[in-house]
């Protein structure tokens, strides 16, 4: 296995875990907060999608599909406190945008050489191109830990 294949496995596992946790949740359930002051899943999905777009554009400028008009404005730090479903995309729309973005990520990953993964990014939390691609799986899993709590609060059985 080479670096590219290892990074793709991490990205794919992050996708499997994350989407597994939300596949049977309704739009209303995506607004449930795991704790007071925590962000609901709908907002977190938008944040993750937007972050992936930004991160991959840092290491592969222009590689990512454009986000839909108004997407960034719906998923800001200020909007995180809102529980008004009309201010956010529906789950089906979010997942469609996610799949478009993830396809861009995987296409950009495929174009990298092993030497490219060692190139610096200038970003503290992901100092190399390889680290930035790795973030695309780990960032999602980090948030999915909260989603496991939401699922239990909503009466769902553990998935993993």
What are these regions (language model features)?
Residues 19-23, 116-120:
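Acidic-glycine-rich active-site phosphate/pyrophosphate-binding loop
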Residues 11, 15-18, 22, 98, ...:
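Hydrophobic alpha-helical core bundles mediating ligand binding, dimerization, or RNAP-core interactions
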Residues 77-116, 131-136:
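Acidic/histidine-rich alpha-helical segments that form the ligand environment
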């Amino acid at each position: 296995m080479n670096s590219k294949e290892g990074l793709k496995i991490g990205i794919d596992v992050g996708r499997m875990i994350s989407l597994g946790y939300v596949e049977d949740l309704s739009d209303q359930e995506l607004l449930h907060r795991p704790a007071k002051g925590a962000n609901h899943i709908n907002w977190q999905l938008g944040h993750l999608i937007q972050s992936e777009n930004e991160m991959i554009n840092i290491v592969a400028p222009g590689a990512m599909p454009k986000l839909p008009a108004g997407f960034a404005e719906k998923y800001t730090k200020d909007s995180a406190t809102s529980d008004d479903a009309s201010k956010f995309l529906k789950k089906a729309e979010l997942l469609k945008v996610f799949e478009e973005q993830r396809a861009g990520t995987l296409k950009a990953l495929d174009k990298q050489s092993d030497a490219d993964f060692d190139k610096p990014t200038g970003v503290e939390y992901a100092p190399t191109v390889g680290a930035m691609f790795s973030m695309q799986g780990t960032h999602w899993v980090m948030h999915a830990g909260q989603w496991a709590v939401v699922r239990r609060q909503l009466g769902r059985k553990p998935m993993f």
